[in-house]
Amino acid sequence: MSSKTLYEKLVESHTIRELDNEGHVLLYIDRSILNEYTSPQAFSGLRERGRTVRHPDTFLLNIDHVNPTRSQRDVLMTDPGGQLQVDYFRENAADFGITLFDVLDPRQGIEHVVAHEQGLVMPGMVIAAGDSHTTTYGAFGALGFGIGTSEIEHLLATQTLVYRKLKTMRVSVQGELPFACSAKDIVLELLERIGADGATGYAIEFVGEAISALSVEGRMTLCNMAVEAGARGAIIAPDKKVFDYIYGKPQMPVGELWQQALLEWSQLSSDADAVFDKTVAINCHDLEPKVTWGISPDQTGSITGRVPFPEQETNPLKRLALEKALHYMGLTAGMLLKDIRISHAFIGSCTNGRIEDLRAVAKVLEGRKIASHVRGIIVPGSTMVRRQAEEEGLAKIFIAAGFEWRHSGCSMCLAMNEDVLSPGDRCASGTNRNFPGR
């Protein structure tokens, strides 16, 4: 038997049949979490064709993209189109018998936070959803990837997808993370090295002592942002940290079934002699806290660094990209990154809106005040995270520092509600993307 990577094992175990000689397979999908933004047309397609949802119990509908995050979360959406999406989403949940986490549900939150809180993500699963950051679930030893609306319709009707197998990339991260560095700095380092398209067509597996040392929530940040390098999957072999983290979650097996699951999950790893199509090595020894400065996640540098000079870039396409970024951001080449003036600060999103993230923010903010010219907003990743942050006294620290303490939702990351910037604003954000308009 040939040696296999963990990614290859997961795909193989979920393959119903091979479709051709070009790597296309019919893939069984274990779970899907759908939001109000990308799924409406999929349900319309089901109705038009007279189809039903094959396994409603494997889906969760969750409102997170367009809902307001201010105190009155049950009021009408600020955008009429958003309100229409929410109304239709509620109708879809009722008509097709799928569980819905509505805006006032105590379990509601950003889908990639809610999913693991509710125990919907288990090692060895294959999960597809209408959001590119479904790669987050790789932190649990699952394969997660985003799909388009037409694929959502197919998945709802058949519980399967036509899937093209990916190449594999091994990213080895060694050494101990320096002070003030986190999983976010690791993935920004990777982006700076390989670029925003460096992992296109690949599934990444993260390995190494630095990965093992990360918390499960840190690993989620890492896998979440792998898609920013073009990866359609990111995975980390599950270990005791993962098993302890998911134990007791609402949908997890219990008793003897839990013990049986542990035996299976503990076998989920790449073979020692498995061959990857590409390898990348990162040593954390010299890593510094990093920040993106431009209009692509790979336009990044150490906080002690400078905005680059486009004329020093030999690649003409990259040089043009740098010039566009400087113009859009209103920056000057050579200026210190730490001197870039901001008007807003945003903490939240499926990348950095979990309780560990908020604890880290509170440590920095305690006893300090936000600058008078900066508007600060903190949006917890879920209602459960919000409640826990308040119980731990974190919310009081945020408010005392001058930040607005909001309810859960995607908020400024996608900006499909009132949480938006105005032309000329510049925001320091804990999200995953810095594209123009986001």
Residue ranges and their predicted role:
Residues 1-438:
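Fe-S-dependent hydro-lyases/dehydratases of central metabolism
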